[in-house]
Amino acid sequence: MKYAAALTAIAALAARAAAVGVSGTPVGFASSATGGGDATPVYPTTTDELVSYLGDDEARVIVLSKTFDFTDTEGTTTTTGCAPWGTASGCQLAINKDDWCTNYEPDAPTTTVTYNTAGELGITVNSNKSLIGEGTSGVIKGRGLRMVSGVSNIIIQNIAVTDINPEYVWGGDAITLDEADLVWIDHVTTARIGRQHYVLGTDADSRVSITNNYINGESDYSATCDGHHYWNVYLDGSSDKVTFSGNYLYKTSGRAPKVQDNTYLHIYNNYWENNSGHAFEIGSGGYVLAEGNYFSNVDTVLETDTFEGALFSSDSASSTCESYIGRSCVANVNGGDLTGTSTTVLSNLSGDTLPSADAASTSPASNAGQGNL
């Protein structure tokens, strides 16, 4: 009987391992990402084990089947911060990171801030990793993920990253890339984040695809003091190509996305709902092709006062794209001021194979994020 039970257990484990893997294939600029490939799946059970698997030099398929709570793993830090947006209960406060309060908000009242230290810096993710969640069980709480300094070939799929010092600006980012290549982030839910849900830093992030993710901006704290998160998607690289598609951006109020500094963004088939501020902020060096996107109850789709980049976008189908990318571009719905005719954007993307956009719809609201593979 014991022998039979052992065989049954071994068979169950083998079936579980065989069933685990990346679902689907990446699209867009990171279409050749393979992550950990066919490495034998590993199942971390502690936060230390998860950190070790993500940061080592082995190709790995890492499966999350529980919540990994980093909230209290490094204790708390108490220091002086500031209150740039007021001290009402729904307003974020700011940590004085790198003298930010001192240099950028010198007139803001100072205040004491106490935050969870672990959230400040994300977990290092090394090259050739697939990080996959089982069902809706794979959650990283209290700390984000960080892909920097030349790492490449990473897939993150079907997990949630949540609760990173949401009271405090500079409390931590959910997903950070800075000098990373071939990164596919798919069906990830991010919620209650202190700073950015996604940030691509000033070094080049050459080929990145951010697809089918749920950016949940609903929070008890925000820089706009209205329960809508302001810091969402910040694309700031020196030579970046980013595919952003199928994502659901809910209850945001700014930087959704902010694009600048030689970043090429193909942003299509996303759905913005209940944005109390602006969605797009396009600065100098931001090159954006926006098509097939749907906007519902968005106060300002494009921040026109600070616009310094290049944009091709329309609320009607455009055949101009045909001679550059081999097909017509697809109309946005309720795009407001998100209209641009820059053929510079199209010309610079003409050498790339761009995915085709579908008609704009609200389907990301039910299809994006963890648990919707």
From Swiss-Prot:
EC number(s) reported in the record: 4.2.2.10
Disulfide feature: 82-101, 91-225, 321-329
Source organism, top-level taxon: Eukaryota
Family the UniProt entry places it in: Belongs to the polysaccharide lyase 1 family.
Positions of the UniProt region annotated as Disordered: 354-373
One biological process term in Gene Ontology: cell wall organization
One GO MF term: pectin lyase activity
Protein name, per record: Pectin lyase D
Summary of the function given for this chain in its UniProt record: Pectinolytic enzymes consist of four classes of enzymes: pectin lyase, polygalacturonase, pectin methylesterase and rhamnogalacturonase. Among pectinolytic enzymes, pectin lyase is the most important in depolymerization of pectin, since it cleaves internal glycosidic bonds of highly methylated pectins.
Compartment(s) where it occurs, according to its Swiss-Prot or TrEMBL record: Secreted
Biased composition (Low complexity): 354-366
Post-translational modification: May be O-glycosylated; does not contain N-acetylglucosamine.
PANTHER family cross-referenced by the UniProt entry: PECTATE LYASE 18-RELATED (PTHR31683), PECTIN LYASE A-RELATED (PTHR31683:SF16)
Residues making up the signal peptide according to the UniProt record: 1-19
Reaction catalyzed: Eliminative cleavage of (1->4)-alpha-D-galacturonan methyl ester to give oligosaccharides with 4-deoxy-6-O-methyl-alpha-D-galact-4-enuronosyl groups at their non-reducing ends
Keywords: Carbohydrate metabolism, Cell wall biogenesis/degradation, Disulfide bond, Glycoprotein, Lyase, Polysaccharide degradation, Secreted, Signal
Catalytic center residues: 255
Enzyme class, first EC level, given as a word: lyase
Classification via Pfam families: Pectate_lyase_4
Lineage per the UniProt record: Eukaryota, Fungi, Dikarya, Ascomycota, Pezizomycotina
InterPro entries noted in UniProt: Pec_lyase, Pectin_lyas_fold, Pectin_lyase_fold/virulence, PEL
The UniProt record lists the keyword Glycoprotein: yes
KW Magnesium (keyword) present: no
